[in-house]
C-alpha cells in the first residue's frame, strides 16, 4: 500500500507569481502536441497533403482556446449546472478547478471546424491530422491530476499492490466507512482508517495516463503511419478514448455531487458511450466511402 506524496500544488514560485502544476501540465501538453505534430510532417503521405509547421502553430492556438473554453463550460453544464445556475459568477473562477474532457472535446471540435474553414480544408482532414497529437496532452493533464492528488479512484483492498492513500480523500473516506459497512468489514478497512485516517484507493489518474495517454497514442501513431481513408484516424480516436475512459471509470470515484447514474454508470461513462458509437459509425463510413471511391476510379480507368 502506497501513500500519495501530497505534492505542493505550486510548482514554481516567481516572486509574487505562483506557477501551479496543473497549469504547467497544460504547457507540457501543448509542447508535446507540437513535437508529435512536427514528427507527423516527416511522414510522406502527411507531407503530401501540404501541412506545414505554421499550420501546427495556428492549429494549437485554436486548440488551446477550444480546450479551455469548452472544458470549463462543459464542466459547468455536465457536472454542476445547478450550482453554477445559482452562483453564475463562479463560472469564471477557473483557478478553483473544474474542467471536463468531454466539454473540452466539443470545444476543440468547434475550434477545428473554424480552422478547417479558414484553411479551406475539410473538417475530417484536420481532425485526422490532430488525432495522434492528443493522447500525449491527455497524459500530461492526468499527471497534473495525480500531482494535485485529485480525481482519485474508488476504495479498494489494502492488499492490492496498486492501492494508494490520498490525503485529500480523508473526509470522503470517513463517510465511505459508514455507507459501506459490509465491504469495510471484508477488507478490514476500519483498522486501516484507524492507523492512517485514510482508505486505500485506486490511483485512477495513473490508469488514465496508461490507457488514454500511452496506449491510445501508440494505437493512433501506428494506425496513422500509413495512408488511411479520410475520417478513419478520427474514428479510431473516438473509439479508443471512449473505451479507455469507460473502462477507467469503473475504478475512478464518481463525482460526489452526481454519484452513479442510470444502470450504475458514471457521468463520464454516459458521455463516453456516444463517442464510441460515433467512432464505430464513422470508421465504417470512412472505409465504405473509400471502397466506393476506389471502385469508381477502377471503373473509369
Swiss-Prot record:
Pathway where this protein functions: Protein modification; lipoprotein biosynthesis (diacylglyceryl transfer)
Residues binding a 1,2-diacyl-sn-glycero-3-phospho-(1'-sn-glycerol): 142
GO MF term set: phosphatidylglycerol-prolipoprotein diacylglyceryl transferase activity
Transmembrane parts of this sequence: 17-37, 59-79, 97-117, 129-149, 203-223, 230-250, 257-277
Annotated GO CC locations: plasma membrane
Broad class of where this protein is predominantly found: membrane
UniProt keyword terms in alphabetical order: Cell inner membrane, Cell membrane, Membrane, Transferase, Transmembrane, Transmembrane helix
Record PROSITE patterns: LGT
Any GO BP annotation: lipoprotein biosynthetic process
Membrane topology: Multi-pass membrane protein
First-level EC class: transferase
EC annotation from Swiss-Prot or TrEMBL: 2.5.1.145
Function: Catalyzes the transfer of the diacylglyceryl group from phosphatidylglycerol to the sulfhydryl group of the N-terminal cysteine of a prolipoprotein, the first step in the formation of mature lipoproteins.
NCBIfam families associated with the record: lgt (TIGR00544)
Similarity comment: family membership: Belongs to the Lgt family.
UniProt-recorded name of the protein: Phosphatidylglycerol--prolipoprotein diacylglyceryl transferase
Organism: Paraburkholderia phymatum (strain DSM 17167 / CIP 108236 / LMG 21445 / STM815)
